[in-house]
Amino acid sequence: MKKINQVGSLITGIIWVVVGVILDFVIQLGSTYSKVGIVNWLGVDKNHPIGIAVMLIVAAILTAITVWILSYAVKRKAPKTSLHPFRGDKLAWVGYGYAMILGAGMVTVALQYVFSHQKMTASNQVALEEMAKKGGAALVFVVVLAVFVAPLVEELIFRGIILNYFFKEGPWWFNVIISGVLFGYFHVYQDFQIFALIQYSLMGISLAVVYKKTKQIQYSIATHMLNNGIAALSLIGMAFGS
């Protein structure tokens, strides 16, 4: 009976992951095309403030709906999931998690030099940098997506759902690795690169450890936001420096 329940939980979790990924794409496409539609309808420049405002409003609405749906999924397995008052001892894990992510980046760079004798940038990162360099609406879209949308949605999918539906009763580390690898693959499947997979997977594992140690998803979300927020500063610098 226990094995049947575990299989049922796994299948349900897979369905929720697919739903989450689809909703993530809906946010990106919906916010992008809403901006394109309004600027074309008004006959104004693609970087017009009205277009950017519509894009942000649509992104906010779609993100709120997605967070509500995915939170419902997580709460079915972890009923106490919600925004709790931040505690100092648990907040420290945001710093630990960010340090682990930095360490993961260093390990990946070292592996690149050992096996390929050069440092390569993930295609996903290159695409974000190219969009950011365009400035205007593209820069706003990238920053909002990276700093706010991605941490909220991806943490609910890859930590909230996977760590609660996938082998929750198994060894502590087992679904942590699954969470990390699936998170990594999600970021490289369009243009697979082994070193990018390693880096994103290690980042995902770091975020999973934060969630498991604190038992509250707000801390892995905060860690994800911190990491992406700092990275976004360099994107903004590129945009204004180009």
Question: Can you say where each PLM-predicted feature lies in the sequence?
Answer:
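Alpha-helical membrane-spanning segments of integral membrane proteins, especially the hydrophobic core
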Residues: 90-102, 130-142
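Membrane-interface interhelical connector segments
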Residues: 114-136
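Short, functional N-terminal and low-complexity linear motifs
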Residues: 3-5, 17, 62, 77-78, ...
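N-terminal, membrane-interfacial amphipathic/helix-forming hydrophobic leader that caps
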Residues: 1-95, 99, 105, 109, ...
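Charged, low-complexity, helix/coiled-coil-prone segments
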Residues: 55, 99-109, 119-126, 140-154
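Transmembrane helix-loop-helix hairpins at the membrane interface
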Residues: 131, 135-242
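A broad structural signal for alpha-helix termini and local helix breaks/kinks
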Residues: 42, 115-118, 170, 214
